[in-house]
Swiss-Prot record:
Domain remark from Swiss-Prot or TrEMBL: The C-terminal conserved inhibitory domain (CCID) negatively regulates the transcriptional activity of the protein.
Segments of skewed composition (Basic and acidic residues): 155-172
Subcellular location(s) of the protein: Nucleus
Claim: DNA-binding is one of the keywords in the record: yes
Outcome after substituting residue 227 to V: Shows normal transcriptional activity
The protein, known as: Chorion-specific transcription factor GCMb
Native organism: Homo sapiens
Length: 506
């Protein structure tokens, strides 16, 4: 049927064709009583008036593939036809129809669609554009005015009809269902195979029967390998080796006779000495191992200092300094002059004075005269009322320095005692003056008694030649205090200078 005849038949049947109006008129017909039926495939120069309640008209629905086009009038919606996508081989479907796909609205999607193969014959696809409006695409116009929606088409489609939008949606949904039915069993089989593999991998250990009597098997741990359950070697606690300061038992101690040497010296060890504090409230922070001295069996160690007639081992010392060394890297005294004294008191300390084999270090040739001049006592006793026994260095009147040895010419106000003489101290807490009994050997002089506190001054010793930085660290004193509540060891450097070198005091 010719297009003019179709247009005439549609125009005769259309109510909108009976009225004279154009989509661009400023004033549209008003008070409309009749409306046209919705047309999905309008073709040619036609006009329709739809009711504003028509759902398809509200969506601007059309069977042709139409896209929105720019329009300067905001009240008028302009759409143009895209054409149709067909197979290049003009293949036919099983029902005998031709493949005529609906072109995609988006430009990029339309280009991708053209690169795809024909779903029927897998040949190439091509787009047939619409040129039905004087060489341009057929244009449709939509306008809402009052209670009516006005539609006007310009041009005749010169291409076959594509799939309608409803048909395209139905086809796509069918394809999706088909693909889902194809991939769902495959995914299910993949999941089942993965589950079987997991069961197989875990089945190696699941087939092992459990132990019937686990208590029959004993676990033997290697004692040489440190484990969390086995404590690692650590520093011994101080309260284990704490010496009780019992006055009754302390009075029964007696020193063995001292050993006599031809050349009395002060033997100081090269490595630093460490002392264990007898107070359980402090922990040992010294990097050196703790040395414990047993009164019954004394090993040959480097903790003993031989001072001609007195050898002492200090187990109570400063709680702030777990370890101090008598010899630093330059073999000098570690604390320097001017430093604050380290005076600490402990509740359970013990001062032991007994003989042991001295440690000889040839790098420290320190000696002093063994036979002092008459009238110069070796030890000066000072009696006080605080029951404090301290040994301090006595300042000599003169001292001569040589390359390797400093010798003391005279020791004034000192009493010399034989080297084989033992001494026992009998302190009494907070009572009358204490007496110090000096027990003599069979060949020594009779014991002497000293009332009150015993304050002994040790002789000044000579230190080998060292740099100035180390010589300034050579003035220290030891104060050993005994009281009724405990003992105190004071490592004091507050004494004035007693070494003289080149008319300079150190």
């Amino acid at each position: 049927m010719p297009a003019a005849a179709v247009q005439e038949a549609v125009g005769v049947c259309s109510y909108g064709m009976q009225l004279s109006w154009d989509i661009n008129d400023p004033q549209m017909p008003q008070e409309l009583a009749l409306f046209d039926q919705f047309r999905e495939w309008p073709d040619g120069y036609v006009r329709f008036i739809y009711s504003s309640d028509e759902k398809k008209a509200q969506r601007h629905l059309s069977g042709w593939a139409m896209r929105n086009t720019n329009n300067h009038n905001g009240h008028i919606l302009k759409k143009s036809c895209l054409g149709v996508v067909v197979c290049t081989q003009a293949c036919t479907l099983p029902d005998g129809s031709r493949l005529q796909l609906r072109p995609a609205i988006c430009d990029k999607a339309r280009l991708k669609q053209q690169k795809k193969a024909c779903p029927n014959c897998h040949s190439a696809l091509e787009l047939i554009p619409c040129r039905g409006h004087s060489g341009y695409p057929v244009t449709n116009f939509w306008r809402l005015d009052g209670n009516a929606i006005f539609f006007q088409a310009k041009g005749v489609h010169d291409h076959p009809r594509p799939e309608s939008k409803s048909e395209t949606e139905a086809r796509r949904s069918a394809i999706k269902r088909q693909m889902a039915s194809f991939y769902q069993p495959q995914k299910k089989r993949i999941r089942e195979s993965e589950a079987e593999e997991n069961q197989d991998s875990s089945g190696h250990f699941s087939n092992i029967p459990p132990l019937e009597n686990p208590e029959d098997f004993d676990i033997v741990t290697e004692t040489s390998f440190p484990i969390p359950g086995q404590p690692c070697p650590s520093f011994p606690k101080s309260d284990v080796y704490k010496a009780t300061c019992d006055l009754a038992t302390f009075q029964g101690d007696k020193m063995p006779p001292f050993q006599k040497y031809s050349s009395p010296r002060i033997y100081l060890p090269r490595p630093p000495c460490s002392y264990e504090l007898a107070n359980p409230g402090y922990t040992n922070s010294s990097p050196y191992p703790t040395l414990y001295k047993d009164s019954t069996s004394i090993p040959n160690d480097t903790d003993w200092v031989h001072l001609n007639t007195l050898q002492c081992n200090v187990n109570s010392y400063s709680s702030y300094e777990r370890s101090f060394d008598f010899t630093n890297k330059q073999h000098g005294w570690k604390p320097a002059l001017g430093k604050p004294s380290l005076v600490e008191r402990t509740n359970h300390g013990q001062f032991q004075a007994m003989a042991t084999r001295p440690y000889y270090n040839p790098e420290l040739p320190c000696r002093y005269l063994t036979t002092p001049p008459p009238g110069a006592p070796a030890l000066q006793t000072v009696i006080t009322t605080t029951t404090k026994v301290s040994y301090q260095a006595y300042q000599p009147p003169a001292m001569k320095y040589s390359d390797s040895v400093r010798e003391v010419k005279s020791l004034s106000s000192c009493n010399y005692a034989p080297e084989d003489t033992g001494m026992s101290v009998y302190p009494e807490p907070w009572g009358p003056p204490v007496t110090v009994t000096r027990a003599a050997s069979p060949s020594g002089p009779p014991p002497m008694k000293i009332a009150g506190d015993c304050r002994a001054i040790r002789p000044t010793v000579a230190i080998p030649h060292e740099p100035v930085s180390s010589r300034t660290d050579e003035a220290e004193t030891w104060d050993v205090c005994l009281s009724g509540l405990g003992s105190a060891v004071s490592y004091s450097d507050r004494v004035g200078p007693f070494f003289t070198y080149n008319n300079e005091d150190f």
